Amino acid sequence: MFLETLIHGVTFCVPFFSKSARIHTLSKDVFQQRKFPGNTLWAAALNRFTAYLFASKELSSKQAYLAQDFVNVCKDASVFQNVYYYELKKNILTDLGFSDLKNSDKSLALSKSSSTFDLQKIKKIHDCLLSEYRKYVRYQERIEETRPDLQKQLTDLKNPIEWYPGARKLRRHIIMHVGPTNSGKTHRALERLKTCKKGIFAGPLRLLAHEIYNRLQANGIACNLYTGEEIRNDYPFPQVVSCTVEMCNLSTTFDVAVIDEIQMMADPSRGYAWTQCLLGLQAKEIHLCGEESVVKLVRSIAKMTQDDFTVYRYERLNPLHVAEKSLNGKLSELKDGDCVVAFSRKNIFTLKSKIDQALGKKSAVIYGSLPPEVRNQQASLFNSKSSDENILLASDAIGMGLNLGVKRIVFSDLKKFSGVSTIDIPVPQIKQIAGRAGRHNPNGSKQSAGIVTTLYQKDFAKLNRAMNLPTKNLFNACIGAKDDLFFRYLSLFSDDIPQKLIFDRYFKLAKTTTPFVVSEGALSTFIIEYLDHIKGLTIKDKIKLLGCPVLKHSKYAPLFIREIGCVIAQGKRLQIYDLKSVPLEILERGIPTTETELQQLEQLHKLIVAYMWASIRYPAILQNGAAEKTKAIAEAFLIKGISKLQK
């Protein structure tokens, strides 16, 4: 079966499996749902198991600690998708033959045999948990007893400066360009980059790396592009390389390097990439663009590396003001050039529907799960005077990497869901988003002042306070595991021990010195669990796949990572349409007509990008041709789908 789609005058022909052959096994997985009877039984059995454990006089203090740890993670397995315990839960419920998982708790409770049935199941689950806990204790004891002295040596991360001997041989000059959004700091650094013989730009986003690549090429500068998902070697000897920070080349010598958003080095999930760029780049001049909050931290690191250090400070090119009042919830007061900021995809589309109805016009949308190419298209619509999309609905994704003709930022809320709980938006993030107001004028005319306000009065005082708070200094630079040491550490242990437990032990033992901290976010540890027990997959392959850009809570992630791991282990050459874990049948629907279909297409696009990321690292196994075509089709459908929803 083939899907034919016309995009920009080119017909793509992509083979697909039949829907019946490509149903994703996890799409029917109900174990993550909280209201199903399987979870009711699980919770009851877990309570019984907990009571048994902590009533036992045989438990040592060490085992009591492990018991509490085991119970906590079992309890949260369905919420946080901790694979080791999540699989335990799923397997136990499945093995017990409890197949009637689609009925609600209420209907189960009303069934005649429910009370007897529940008691039997609870007892069996309790027994399985007890057996599993004993295995868990044995795993922990084996980990702790395996070469403890060598474990301590391999987790000693106290001197990351010495990890980069090539950079230590150079007398580098670190030059900081510090200022708020729209102060010209990055422009100044890029002007220096244009004049060097050999340079590199490293930024936080693929979209930004593309923008610099296109801009430099338009200026006649030979520039290549390196991102996690795409490599463009247009020139054998480029003057400049534009890349994302994770792809920064630390083994080549440059005259000038520019690292954007250097304050991100304190970020728990990706900060390690900025820190390793700062410590490891072999460049005579390193220009760092960022916020005042990171100056003291970088200065202290420059002193440790014995590099020269200079700071240039910049003021905004146009003023930024907080409005006199909020909009008091009146959508009719929104004007052309406004950007309404919401912190979830659901809230963005809810607001979009209300705003489009209230104003009788379409609005553009930008949020994190949209592909960069689609975000760029929506930004162009918003910036264009000939377009009808004169109001923008956006998430915090607008904080970096897009040139937007925003006149006024309107916060719809100052809270967001962190993945665990609802939190206040951090002050630096509020300031960064607010700074987008008045940031860019696509026509090159004089820039007007930027205005920032809130949609509702309840948030207005909080916004005022945030905008007037002084900058707080950052004190920590995140580092990741050193590859060779981490490889040796993982190699110490037997293959039958769940690698998640080994990872937990590694981070527990890891030791650093100020200002460096180890970031667990530097390793997508949930991925390692999907790769457990794949025959023929080496430890080096597993470490390499830890960077695969799949979302932790994606229902497609487990099967996708496992299938990629198996393919690599077997050395089997294939195209993306050969993978059962990639639901390409979504493309058969054509252009999405509902928000649900749009979201499903976004999830498919992320899987395609993850495949392309893996194909760059395993080009002899994972072929890229069909993936590039399906990616283009998905992006075209997304653009047209958003356009349909805007009508």
UniProtKB/Swiss-Prot annotation:
Superkingdom in the source lineage: Eukaryota
InterPro entries per UniProt: DEXQc_SUV3, Helicase_ATP-bd, Helicase_C-like, P-loop_NTPase, RNA-DNA_Helicase, SUV3_C, Suv3_DEXQc
EC number: 3.6.4.13
Reaction catalysis annotation: ATP + H2O = ADP + phosphate + H(+)
Gene Ontology biological process: mitochondrial RNA 3'-end processing
Residue sites binding ATP per the record: 179-186
Domain Helicase C-terminal: 326-486
Subcellular location: Mitochondrion matrix
Gene Ontology CC entries for this record: mitochondrial degradosome; mitochondrial matrix; mitochondrion
A Pfam family it matches: DEXQc_Suv3
Domain (Helicase ATP-binding): residue spans on this chain: 166-303
GO molecular function, one term: RNA binding
Enzyme class: hydrolase
SUPFAM superfamilies assigned: P-loop containing nucleoside triphosphate hydrolases
Entry keyword annotation includes Glycosyltransferase: no
Keywords: ATP-binding, Helicase, Hydrolase, Mitochondrion, Nucleotide-binding, RNA-binding, Transit peptide
Family assignment from sequence similarity: Belongs to the helicase family.
Entries under PANTHER family matching the protein: ATP-DEPENDENT RNA AND DNA HELICASE (PTHR12131), ATP-DEPENDENT RNA HELICASE SUPV3L1, MITOCHONDRIAL-RELATED (PTHR12131:SF1)
Role summary: Required for intron-independent turnover and processing of mitochondrial RNA. It is a key control element in nuclear-mitochondrial interactions.
Identification of the protein by name: ATP-dependent RNA helicase suv3, mitochondrial
Lineage: Eukaryota, Fungi, Dikarya, Ascomycota, Taphrinomycotina
Gene that encodes the chain: suv3
